[in-house]
A protein has these predicted regions:
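N-terminal glycine-rich dinucleotide-binding loop that anchors FAD/FMN and/or NAD(P) in oxidoreductases
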Residues: 30-51
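ATP-dependent carboxylate/acyl-activation modules
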Residues: 2-5, 259-277
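Rossmann-like NAD(P)(H) cofactor-binding subdomain of soluble oxidoreductases
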Residues: 74-144
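Short acidic-hydrophobic, aromatic-tinged amphipathic segments that line or gate anion-handling sites
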Residues: 52-56
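NAD(P)+-binding Rossmann beta1-loop-alpha1 motif at the extreme N-terminus of oxidoreductases
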Residues: 1-30
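Redox-cofactor binding/interface segments in oxidoreductases and associated redox assembly factors
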Residues: 67-69, 108
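Internal alpha-helical scaffold of NAD(P)-dependent oxidoreductase catalytic cores
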Residues: 121-239, 265-272
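An anion/phosphate-binding loop that grips the pyrophosphate of nucleotide cofactors and donors
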Residues: 63-64
Length: 278
C-alpha cells in the first residue's frame, strides 16, 4: 500500500515481493489486500507507470536510490521477535548495493525492537558491502498505518520519524515524504525503533485501560461509555503529555488510596482488574 501512496506523490517506485500471485494482481491494477480505495489507487499508479513490481530485489535496487524494507517480523514461540525475513532481505539488498554504481539508502520500516537495525541489519550490510557511509546509508522510518484506513493515515500521519546514520540519509528519507503535512522528528536509529514500540504499547495500554474501566463500571451499573467520553474530554491532564515523563513518582495522598479502593470494589464483585492490580 505504501508503494502505491509514494507513487501517487510523484516518485518512481519499484515494489518487490516474492509472491508471484500478488505481483500478477498488482500488474493487473488490482490490490492484493481488501481495503477502501486501494484497488483504485494501485490501478492508477500501475497504469501511469509510476509503480511497477518485480520479484527481483537487485533489479529494484539498481533502478532506485532508496530501499524501504517492509517485511514481517513474526513472534517466536518464546515471544521474541523473529528477524529471519529482515535478515534475508538485507542479504539480497546488500548484494545489489555492492553491485550497483552510486550510493544507496537502506531504510528499515518493519517494527523491530531497539537495536535491531544496528545489531542485525548493519553487520550484514557491512559484511557484504563494507562500512556504512560512502557506498550506502542506513535509516529507520516506522510507518503508522492502521488496517482499513491506511491511505488516510499515509496522507495525514501524526508525525514522521526519521532515524538515520547521517545527514544525507535523513534528507533522503524526508524527501520521499515531500508534501505530506506532518511534523518530522529526527533522532538516532535506536530511538526511532523505540518510538514505534512506545506508540504501539501505549495504544495497547489505552485499550486495556478502557476495557478495565468498562468491566468495573458494569459491576456497579454505571455507563462506562459515558464515563470514558467525559474522561477523554479533559485534554489538560487525561489526554495530554501530563504524567508521561519516565521516572515520574507514583504516590501522594490520593492516587495509591484511590487505586486500592477501585480495584477492591471490582475484585469483590468478581471482576479483578489485572492492569491496575499490577
Amino acid at each position: 500500500m505504501s508503494a502505491a501512496c509514494f507513487a501517487k506523490r510523484g516518485h518512481e517506485v519499484v515494489g518487490v515481493d516474492p509472491d508471484e500471485r500478488k505481483l500478477e494482481l498488482m500488474r493487473a491494477g488490482k490490490a492484493p489486500v481488501v481495503e477502501e480505495g486501494v484497488d483504485e489507487l494501485i490501478g492508477e499508479v500501475i497504469a501511469d507507470g509510476s509503480l511497477r513490481v518485480t520479484s527481483d530485489a537487485a533489479e529494484a535496487v539498481a533502478a532506485t536510490d532508496v530501499s524501504l524494507v517492509c517485511v514481517g517480523t513474526p513472534s517466536a514461540p518464546d515471544g521474541s521477535l523473529g528477524v529471519q525475513y529482515v535478515e534475508r532481505v538485507t542479504e539480497e539488498i546488500g548484494a545489489a548495493i555492492a553491485a550497483k554504481d552510486g550510493r544507496h539508502t537502506f531504510v528499515l520500516r518493519s517494527t523491530v525492537v531497539p537495536g535491531t537495525t544496528l545489531g542485525v541489519v548493519k553487520p550484514i550490510l557491512e559484511r557484504i558491502v563494507g562500512p556504512v557511509g560512502e557506498k550506502y546509508g542506513l535509516a529507520y522510518n516506522p510507518e503508522f498505518l492502521r488496517e482499513g484506513t491506511s491511505i488516510k493515515d499515509f496522507d495525514a500521519p501524526p508525525f514522521t520519524i526519521v532515524g538515520a546514520s547521517d545527514e544525507r540519509d535523513a534528507q533522503a528519507v524526508e524527501g520521499i515524504y515531500a508534501g505530506v503535512e506532518a511534523p518530522v522528528h529526527r533522532c538516532d536509529i535506536s530511538t526511532a525503533e523505540a518510538i514505534k514500540y512506545a506508540c504501539n504499547l501505549f495504544h495497547a495500554t489505552k485499550i486495556t485501560f478502557a476495557n478495565e474501566i468498562g468491566m468495573a463500571c458494569q459491576t456497579v451499573g454505571v455507563d462506562s461509555r459515558k464515563v470514558m467520553e467525559i474522561v477523554c474530554a479533559d485534554t489538560k491532564l487525561n489526554v495530554s503529555a501530563k504524567y508521561m515523563r519516565p521516572g515520574f513518582a507514583f504516590g501522594g495522598s490520593c492516587l495509591p488510596k484511590d487505586l486500592r479502593a477501585f480495584t477492591h470494589m471490582s475484585r469483590v464483585r468478581n471482576a479483578p482488574l489485572s492492569m491496575f492490580e499490577a
